[in-house]
Amino acid sequence: MTQTSSAFEGIEEIIEDANNNTDIGIPVQGDILNEIISGARLGTLILRSASSGTGKTRQAVGDACLIAYPFRYNTYEQKWEQIGSGQKVMFIATEQTKKEIQRMILAYLTGFNESKFRYGNFSVREKRIIKQALWIMKQYEENFFIVQMPSPRIDLVKNLVREQVMLHGIEYVFYDYVFISPSLLGEFKGVSLRNDEILLMFSTALKELAVELNICMFTSTQVNANADSNTNIRNESSIAGSRAIINKADIGMISARPTKEELDFFSGIGGQVLPNIVTDIYKVRSGEWSQVRIWSYIDLGTLRKEDLYLTDARMEIINFDKHFVYEIDWEDVDYTEVLKKVNEIQ
């Protein structure tokens, strides 16, 4: 519907929103990333691209866990800590089984490598922490829904998301990941469309769902062969299948492994922890930051990530004032008492 209005109409709401931080989303993993994208804002589509084996799914599940669960175990201080938002999440898996996702969740919550949950042989201490993690998952079982969709279609995704948002009040949806499947091609049987056009239609549908339902939609894609060898800031030209996928996204980022030369640079500046992943931010709609690189360390065994440095394309470190602060409305829930109950579990 076409609308015409005065530029002044509603301007006071913008000032009020700024004062109340209503256009800031809840945190995802990574302090620098949150500063760049202003968190997981409702009504937006966040697109993360990477090659196979760089942890696209694990980063997504880690972000989903941080959003869904208020607590996780701090393995250094050996105690449970309140770090998370306690919001409702849905994870749509196109390749992983439910058990694979569940093992990742347990790894994130406990801080134990995921392989522990394949081979067992837990110590007495580990059994206690796992029991506590299971109690947390039970307490917040309405916060994390897993959907297996091995044969995705646009109409199926749209109907599913609308239904689950209505039934459970979900505000954060992870779709893993956008690709051309036989079922998706079958949806357009008899219509002369190229693969890149179909992928654009898929990403458009995800963005429309984000706006229509006022949710934050996360998704990911593969990258083409040029991405790993590119030492400049990677952009939509590195996306496999269709560079037009980014057209509807609000945030666009590509993750890759640092080169030896890049690691030597960070060794030279005396960093105690070397990054094992670099994320190139090439699109930020409604943001001041773009064409920057975030250097992080991610433990793929526990899905936990820490941002270390922010640089430009010339590898010059960017120092910036942090403005990202998100105040979570806990709705009068006393999480001190909840943590006390967790620690009482033996």
What is each residue range found by the language model?
Residues 1-43, 51, 76, 80, ...:
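Core recognition of P-loop NTPase motor domains used across DNA-transaction enzymes
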Residues 41-46, 87:
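Pre-Walker A (Motif I) flank of P-loop NTPase domains
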Residues 3-10, 81-84, 111-119, 145, ...:
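C-terminal regions of RecA-like/P-loop NTPase motor modules
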Residues 55:
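Conserved glycine(s) of the Walker
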Residues 59, 63, 101:
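Hydrophobic positions on the alpha1 helix immediately C-terminal to the Walker A/P-loop
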Residues 13, 31-35, 70-169, 289, ...:
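Cytosolic-facing regulatory segments adjacent to core modules
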Residues 62-72:
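Walker A/P-loop NTP-binding motif
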Residues 144-209:
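Phosphate-binding/switch loop-helix module in NTP-utilizing enzymes
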